[in-house]
Amino acid sequence: MNPSTTQARIVVDELIRGGVRDVVLCPGSRNAPLAFALSDADRAGRIRLHVRIDERTAGYLAIGLAVAERAPVCIAMTSGTAVANLGPAVVEANYARVPLIVLSANRPYEMLGTGANQTFEQLGYFGTQVRAAISLGLAPDLTGPNAADLDTLNAQWRSATCRVLVAATGARSANAGPVQFDIPLREPLVPDPAEPAGGTIPPGRPGGRSWTHTPPVTFDQPLDIDLTPDTVVIAGHGAGEHPNLAELPTVAEPTAPPPANPLHPLALRLAHPKQVIMLGRPTLHRPVSTLLADPSVPVYALTTGPRWPDVSGNSQATGTRAVTSGAPSAAWLRKCAELNEHAVTAVRKQLAAHPMTTGLHVAAAVADALRPGDQLVLGASNPVRDAALVGLRPDGIKVRSNRGVAGIDGTISTAIGAALAHDGRTVALIGDLTFVHDSSGLLIGPTEPTPRSLTIVVSNDNGGGIFELLEQGDPRFSDVSSRIFGTPHDVNIGALCHAYHVDYHQIEADALGAALEDPFQGMRVLEVKADRSSLRSLHASIKAAL
């Protein structure tokens, strides 16, 4: 067996032993040893392999798989720009703490700087965005008088692979995230002609165990908090479970655990709490940001890892869990419950009275159609905010969204990855710009695994509706804002779906519920035409009703 093939097979075997079950592969020549090894593992039923053409979207496919599976996922690619295309996914994985392993095949390092084709200094390319950048080193000659000792190499290669897995899963840091595993490969890049399929490699540990076992670290920082003052909980992305805080009024973002005592984000301005407990990282609502920045309101930050958010610098203490004393007053709980009910009712009444279909109407229709066992994937920009405003019935529903750096890129691919890892129905709600941006993510080859049931709902207001609600949407900029911020595109979404052989229907918002109730297997797109010109007035009417 040649060196590159041997090395690749040992690495793949050890990755599987370390918990990798899904791998995304992008085609190339330099990563051929990895491709053959991964294909063998796929045929043996040890992994599920997903082959994609575009590394940028493939990275987000891996993120969707990793988030839904709560397990490390690898993406393998060839050298050169193939590696650079992983940049956006790596950044998202960093801030969302997703265990994404970038298996970047490389040329032998002596070829760097020589003008060799498809070669650049890719080891360390991702800089501070990865938990580690680890090189396996070039596999030496395994035959002849100067042959290296294969047992020694087996131990070294498996040990290095375990370091990659530990860094990605955060087993020793409580801070999962992306890792670059750079593997220089010398020709020959294909298995030897006389070699049997699958070949043989030196064994790993008995019983399928990892070469180097690393128990996950326990990260526990208790924080004393008195609940007697009027307290609200702000539950952001990655909030974690805190049963002893369940009684408190909670403004929960859609990706946070469902609150037992919800407080609508628009009701927060009227609540006037005396202190805040912040869980995870809030990413959505301006009333939340305003409250967290108020120096007169103490903020206590509880996170599940070593980092904590504090945009305004106002947090008084941090920890991982609250040790509570005291109890909220009945009057405070009653006040917040009334404010929440008033806000929920106001939103729904204003939606019913509004003459145009907007993204909020589409989000409400999707939210009302969800049922226990569903998985909901929300696009960045307006969809995730709309879902928070119309209110979700979160019991038994898993909600996903790329909130690490909150970009619109890769959302279709993320949804497909999440759907591939989910046994039930997945519904994705995204905007038209998000859809167009990642439309190549719809490409699933005829031999590839496909989602069991994925419906992508596209709220199409022909541009960036969120800018209607920001300063850029002020009427005084009306002569230029539509072009330079709204960016109308007039893309035929149905034609795009047809090109990728994806089932497509255009429907009205009030027909969404019935459409989502129909049993569906596979992947489809439902487009709902929406209006963004009236978004500003709709949101103003909701605030006025409060």
UniProtKB/Swiss-Prot annotation:
Enzyme type, top EC level: transferase
Pathway: Quinol/quinone metabolism; 1,4-dihydroxy-2-naphthoate biosynthesis; 1,4-dihydroxy-2-naphthoate from chorismate: step 2/7; Quinol/quinone metabolism; menaquinone biosynthesis
UniProt remark on cofactor binding: Binds 1 thiamine pyrophosphate per subunit.
Signal peptide span: none
Pfam families linked: TPP_enzyme_N
Entry-linked Gene3D superfamilies: 3.40.50.970, TPP-binding domain
Names of the cofactor(s): Mg(2+); Mn(2+); thiamine diphosphate
GO MF annotation list: 2-succinyl-5-enolpyruvyl-6-hydroxy-3-cyclohexene-1-carboxylic-acid synthase activity; magnesium ion binding; manganese ion binding; thiamine pyrophosphate binding
Domain of life, per lineage: Bacteria
Catalyses which reaction(s): isochorismate + 2-oxoglutarate + H(+) = 5-enolpyruvoyl-6-hydroxy-2-succinyl-cyclohex-3-ene-1-carboxylate + CO2
One of the GO biological process terms: menaquinone biosynthetic process
Keyword annotations: Magnesium, Manganese, Menaquinone biosynthesis, Metal-binding, Thiamine pyrophosphate, Transferase
Functional description taken from the UniProt entry: Catalyzes the thiamine diphosphate-dependent decarboxylation of 2-oxoglutarate and the subsequent addition of the resulting succinic semialdehyde-thiamine pyrophosphate anion to isochorismate to yield 2-succinyl-5-enolpyruvyl-6-hydroxy-3-cyclohexene-1-carboxylate (SEPHCHC).
Complex formation: Homodimer.
PANTHER family linked: 2-SUCCINYL-5-ENOLPYRUVYL-6-HYDROXY-3-CYCLOHEXENE-1-CARBOXYLATE SYNTHASE, PROTEIN PHYLLO, CHLOROPLASTIC
Family as reported in the entry's similarity comment: Belongs to the TPP enzyme family. MenD subfamily.
Name of the protein in question: 2-succinyl-5-enolpyruvyl-6-hydroxy-3-cyclohexene-1-carboxylate synthase
Organism: Mycolicibacterium smegmatis (strain ATCC 700084 / mc(2)155) (Mycobacterium smegmatis)
